[in-house]
């Protein structure tokens, strides 16, 4: 491994850390790809390629998985209504949320809450 590749790898790690920190701070908001790309001063197309090459997933998939993990936490630790939880964690389309939730957890939010309590 050359010194240049080590430097590039470290720079990419720092850039990923910055965009992940941004995502964790703003995931409740409607984050556009251009917003995330701007944190690294990149064009959205370059950002998408950079993120996928360095994480193995698209930025949108990462963002939605992060949001789903937060919804999961609230489902099993609070009695809040589902619509409140979704709103709190940045989901605005219930139909899309249900599809993603079922794909990820193979159940509905209500059933999961019942099973884990």
Predicted regions and their residues:
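The short coil/loop that forms the "turn" connecting the two helices of the helix-turn-helix
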Residues: 42, 91-92, 107
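Short hydrophobic/aromatic patch on the recognition helix
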Residues: 46-47, 51, 96-97, 101
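…primarily DNA-binding HTH/wHTH and HhH modules…
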Residues: 98-117
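An amphipathic alpha-helical interaction segment
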Residues: 1-7, 11-14, 42-48
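Terminal helix-turn-helix DNA-binding modules in bacterial transcription factors
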Residues: 17-25, 30-34, 53-93, 114-117
């Amino acid at each position: 491994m050359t010194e240049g590749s080590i430097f590039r790898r470290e720079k990419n790690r720092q850039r990923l850390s910055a965009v992940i920190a941004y995502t964790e701070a703003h995931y409740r908001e409607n984050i556009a790809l251009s917003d995330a790309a701007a944190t690294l001063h990149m064009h959205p197309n370059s950002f998408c390629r950079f993120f996928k090459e360095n994480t193995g997933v698209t930025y949108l998939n990462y963002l939605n998985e992060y949001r789903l993990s937060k919804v999961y936490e609230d489902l099993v630790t609070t009695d809040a209504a589902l619509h409140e939880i979704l709103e709190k964690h940045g989901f605005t389309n219930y139909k899309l949320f249900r599809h993603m939730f079922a794909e990820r957890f193979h159940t509905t939010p209500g059933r999961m809450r019942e099973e884990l309590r």
